[in-house]
Amino acid sequence: MFEVSTKDELKRALTHNEDDIYVVNEKLSQDILERSAKYRFIRYAMLVNGYEIIKIKTFGAVDIKFVKDRSNY
C-alpha cells in the first residue's frame, strides 16, 4: 500500500507501477474523482474521505477504481 497526498507523489506512484495507491488528501481525492469521471475512467466511485485507488492495466491503459472500504483488501 503506497500512500500519497500530493499530485507529484501520485505521479511517482503511478510511474513506479505501485499496485495499491491510497490517497490521504481529500482535495486530491476529489480532483481525481472529477477528472476520472470527466474522462470516464471510473468503474465505481463513492464520495468518501480518502480513496483507495486500484490500478488495473488493460491494453496499456490504466483504469482507476475507487472503493469505500479498505478493510476488504
Predicted feature descriptions by range:
Residues 1-3:
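A short, exposed loop/beta-hairpin motif centered on an aromatic-Gly-Thr core
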